[in-house]
């Protein structure tokens, strides 16, 4: 869980921006989206191989 301590002279908007940035860096939202629905192991394997193909093609 991401935790932000708001400084004395820091505005709430800045604290929210820092929190969102920290969540994005730690991958909380992407992990949530990935686990939102059950994914069969065969589908996971297929997605992983397709991602590897895309990555190889881009290099």
UniProtKB/Swiss-Prot annotation:
It comes from the Bacteria. GO terms for molecular function: structural constituent of ribosome. The keyword Ribosomal protein applies. Residues 43-59 have a biased composition (Basic residues). Residues 35-59 are annotated as: Disordered. The gene is rpsU. Keywords: Ribonucleoprotein, Ribosomal protein. The keyword Ribosomal protein applies. This is Small ribosomal subunit protein bS21. Belongs to the bacterial ribosomal protein bS21 family. The lineage of its organism: Bacteria, Bacillati, Bacillota, Tissierellia, Tissierellales. One of its GO terms (cellular component) is ribonucleoprotein complex. It holds the Pfam family Ribosomal_S21.
